[in-house]
Regions:
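Long amphipathic alpha-helical segments
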Residues: 1-45
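Glycine-rich phosphate-binding loop
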Residues: 112-150
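Short glycine/serine/threonine-rich phosphate/pyrophosphate-binding segments
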Residues: 8, 78-83, 107-108, 127-137, ...
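Glycine-rich oxoanion-binding loops at beta->alpha junctions
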Residues: 52-54, 95-116, 160-162, 178
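Glycine-rich phosphate/diphosphate-binding loop of Rossmann-like nucleotide-binding domains
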Residues: 64-109
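Short, acidic/small-residue loops that bind anionic groups at enzyme active sites
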Residues: 45-47, 137-160, 208
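Short glycine-rich or small-residue beta-strand-to-loop segments that form or flank ligand, phosphate
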Residues: 22-23, 68-74, 97, 123-125, ...
Length: 208
């Protein structure tokens, strides 16, 4: 977010020279264009909703509700953060489905979709305002829930601090919370959980 276009271009060039893909988060349109101008021979892809820049194509098409991760948002204003999490997981080869606009202001919307969450191994819940969605969700489902406070809101909710404090003070045991607007961090937490599950399955099979 605070790196210059020149610094980002240098990092991408070093990754390219090593044959490694790269994902850069918190990149706006102007900076993405500036980086692309500095690297004319690179096939960079800017993902405007997620505000990310990748050195390889990343597709989010065709993801269904059977994906191992489901990302929920309280409202459509949370979409950029949810998309950042979804893209970060896709970059790692993990499919994540989106379930938007299921905030606690209309709790019936979440309750009627609970059956769709059964196949997910990890849930990421993005919410602004008072940030209640992750707490409510963690009280309803057995899967790991990762809460992402979002900076949308007004009054005392402005900036996401109220949502962060609410999630940290949650009475739902085991709720994981990342920093404000940190969709990428939530994705990496989900990836670690999935990696542990996979390693345990492999270990168990090895013992057989």
């Amino acid at each position: 977010q605070h790196k210059t276009a020149e610094q980002i271009a240098a990092i991408l060039e070093s990754f390219h020279n090593r044959g490694e893909p790269a994902l850069v988060t918190r990149v706006d349109a102007a900076k993405a264009a500036a980086v692309a101008a500095l690297l004319p021979g690179h096939d960079l892809q800017w993902h405007h909703q997620a505000r990310c820049l990748s050195s390889v194509p990343i597709s989010l098409d065709g993801i269904d509700t059977a994906a191992p991760v489901t990302i929920l948002s309280g409202g459509t204003s949370d979409l950029p953060v949810a998309k950042e999490a979804q893209l970060a997981l896709a970059f790692q080869g993990i499919a994540a489905s989106l379930m938007l606009d299921v905030g606690v202001a209309g709790l019936h919307r979440l309750l009627e979709r609970l059956p769709l969450l059964r196949s997910a191994q990890v849930l990421i819940a993005c919410a602004g305002m008072e940030g209640a969605l992750p707490t409510v969700l963690a009280g309803l489902v057995p899967q790991p829930v990762i809460g992402v406070p979002v900076s949308v809101g007004y009054g005392v909710s402005a900036g996401g601090r109220a949502a962060l404090d609410g999630m940290l003070a949650s009475c739902a045991p085991g709720l994981t919370v990342v920093n404000i607007d940190n969709g990428y961090g939530a994705a990496m937490a989900a990836l670690r959980i999935l990696s542990c599950s996979t390693e345990r399955v492999v270990a168990d099979r090895g013992e057989e």
